[in-house]
């Protein structure tokens, strides 16, 4: 594997609206991020990925962009952005922005021009079709529910495609003018000093044309747009062109949001000269999710299910490229709630989860608040929810026959707003996030779970994350933890998540994800205990006895 500057880095994702509010308007902002750079550096973060801060009506929290060259005034100014890039650079940190180019906002100038003249230049920037017999061109269902077709404003005989929200019209990537506009913008931002991009929903840019129906998969007579993506061919032409024209010349770090990639395509996506530097491992986030909706999905994974997912990805990727490992992000419930059952949730199991994912082969991502174990919000009413996807899933559950309480429980378990509640900085008013009224409710547990209290507690989850980042960066272990091989260890032993990382050193990572102790045989002599989430360790010549929820990293002779 050709070595790149980002391979040994730790990435921290910031959802700016909920990170830190510097001016008391209830919305996090760029100056707020700048004020916390030293905290992030101390945590061990090298790269900061910002969710969208472009000018936007925020129909989908900034993933509907009205101007790719402007900062939304709610987040600050372009001068603030320049200062953030400069201040990060002083600390040897890099900034990634979200690249959202499957679609734009319906308030973008391109779409406004398309409304004025659907048959003109900008009409071809989108997928605009004539209505025929009052029927849509196809029966695809959008990711946020309902058909993907919407009437073009002022043109009752025409409709446009949106695979997400109706305020997010899809860009026509078949049009080379669209692609050149996208590439021009990417280069503009790279010239400003970005380290690269996280690339949103990019797998959707290639549609299977002409538009056609699929068998309905729900009672609404529609079929998930994902069904079309399974058959769409030729996306590599677009992604390869973008990499050649925009990413390679700048040695940019890029992370693709890619779902359902085929095993024989991994090399194309993240191998040598791949479309992206990396892509996320979504196997565990998708596991147990039902096509019928959240109400029919598993609210949390068992240890064996989680192990099966992460091990499958590690084996599949191998030495082909660098996967990006996550346990949560802005679109998912909180990791400690999704990967640890309620009865197993305790300080040690939270550290175990952190350690198990963080030391896998690949690039570790930390989402804001994850480092202190922020939890899902216990929503008591849909009035507390802002997320458009959650509102749709609530209605899906009701239509399926769920009671209002059952539908709300499903929303609480999976809502994207779980990860979007304000960061809990302290036990002060509004969790120290803002002097004003926060745009989204603060989790009531902020007095027990907050950064300020964990900063001074050497046994806190935050302190454990610092130990993890320090271990990964330690000169004597970095080579092994970044480039060393991965292999499952005692894979059949129930509720044991264990693997080796072998290279210059031989490391054994062990996690006992159960309330009972269990014995684990050792591969050879233990040279050193590198990390332990408990004070004691019980090792004999041939085995180790792991206490309930114990996580330990050993350097072994073999």
Spans of features found by a protein language model:
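Hydrophobic residues within beta-strands of alpha/beta enzymes
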Residues: 48, 197-199
């Amino acid at each position: 594997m050709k070595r790149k500057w980002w391979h040994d880095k730790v990435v921290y994702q910031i959802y700016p609206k909920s990170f830190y509010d510097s001016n008391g308007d209830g919305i996090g902002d760029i100056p707020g991020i700048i004020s916390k750079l030293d905290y992030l550096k101390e945590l061990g973060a090298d790269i900061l990925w910002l969710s969208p801060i472009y000018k936007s009506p925020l129909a989908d929290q900034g993933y509907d962009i009205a101007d790719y060259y402007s900062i939304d005034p709610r987040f600050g100014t372009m001068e603030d952005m320049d200062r953030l890039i400069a201040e990060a650079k002083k600390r040897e940190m890099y900034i990634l922005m979200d690249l959202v180019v499957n679609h734009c906002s319906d308030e973008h100038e391109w779409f406004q021009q398309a409304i004025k003249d659907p048959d003109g230049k900008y009409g071809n920037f989108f997928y605009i079709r004539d209505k025929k017999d009052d029927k849509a061109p196809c029966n695809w269902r959008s990711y946020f529910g309902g058909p993907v077709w919407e009437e073009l404003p002022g043109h009752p005989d025409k409709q446009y495609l949106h695979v997400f929200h109706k305020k997010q019209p899809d860009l026509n990537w078949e049009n080379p003018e669209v692609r050149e506009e996208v590439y021009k913008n990417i280069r503009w931002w790279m010239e400003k000093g970005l380290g690269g991009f996280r690339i949103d929903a990019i797998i959707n840019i290639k549609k299977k044309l002409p538009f056609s129906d699929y068998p309905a998969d729900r009672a609404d007579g529609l079929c998930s747009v994902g069904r079309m993506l399974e058959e769409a061919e030729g996306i590599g032409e677009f992604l390869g062109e973008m990499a050649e024209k925009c990413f390679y010349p700048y040695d940019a770090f890029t992370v693709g949001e890619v779902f359902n990639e085929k095993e024989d395509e991994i090399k194309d996506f993240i191998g040598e000269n791949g479309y992206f530097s990396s892509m996320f491992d979504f196997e565990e986030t998708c596991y147990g999710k039902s096509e019928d909706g959240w109400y029919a999905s598993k609210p949390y994974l068992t240890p064996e299910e989680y192990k099966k997912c992460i091990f499958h990805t590690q084996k599949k990727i191998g030495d082909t490229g660098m996967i990006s490992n996550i346990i949560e992000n802005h679109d998912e419930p909180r990791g400690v709630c999704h990967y640890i059952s309620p009865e197993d949730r305790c300080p040690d199991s939270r550290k175990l989860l952190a350690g198990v994912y963080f030391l896998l082969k690949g690039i570790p991502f930390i989402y804001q608040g994850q480092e202190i174990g922020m939890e899902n919000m216990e929503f008591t009413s849909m009035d507390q929810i802002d997320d458009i996807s959650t509102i749709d899933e609530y209605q899906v559950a009701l239509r399926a026959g769920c009671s209002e309480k059952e539908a709300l429980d499903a929303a609480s378990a999976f809502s994207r707003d779980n990860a979007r509640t304000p960061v809990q900085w302290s036990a002060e008013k509004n969790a120290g996030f803002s002097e004003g009224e926060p745009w989204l409710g603060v989790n009531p547990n902020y007095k027990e779970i907050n950064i300020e209290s964990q900063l001074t507690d050497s046994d806190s989850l935050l302190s454990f994350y610092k130990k993890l980042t320090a271990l990964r960066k330690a000169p004597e272990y970095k080579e092994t933890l970044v480039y060393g091989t991965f292999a499952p260890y005692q894979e059949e032993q129930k509720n044991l998540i264990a693997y080796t990382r072998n290279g210059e050193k031989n490391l054994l990572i062990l996690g006992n994800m159960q309330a009972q102790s269990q014995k684990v045989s050792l591969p050879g002599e233990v040279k050193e205990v590198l990390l332990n989430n408990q004070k004691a360790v019980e090792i004999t010549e041939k085995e180790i006895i792991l206490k309930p929820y114990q996580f330990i990293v050993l350097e072994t002779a073999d």
